[in-house]
């Protein structure tokens, strides 16, 4: 959300059009001073906002998001939820986010990273996009200072996924099962998630 509008005003000065999605009533009131046709304020929950309802064009998303809903927001923007009406991923070219430092490490992690960093969030984000860690931002950069460090990350959406998949929700289910119980072997993890034993064994052989 645009909050009090400090960053938003600078973006408005440089962009052709800015759509700001804000759910907080007080913030909505504080943003009334931005008066230009280039700025449109949307009073809504970002998790319930479909970009196709705003304008038939592509978007760049810039946000300093609440850290506790980072994963749901990314899932919504990248179309990772099982929702046939969610075409947000097709309308976004780039996402720039301020996130918790540990989340940033997970977003950019590859198979060579420590096991705690590489997982569901890493794979499903990088399946759709290239992720770049722009800068680590220390907690003392904010007032009041939070208890965690932050980082600025840039997510560039690819025109096509890295691998062609017919059923994205099935892929998500498989990846989630693989990382749900990291200390178990892969066969047991998939079987515990409800996958057919014979199919799992045959696939892994």
Predicted regions and their residues:
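Catalytic cores of RNA-modifying enzymes
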Residues: 1-168, 173, 205
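C-terminal lobe and adjacent flexible extensions of AdoMet/dcAdoMet transferase-like proteins
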Residues: 157, 175-205
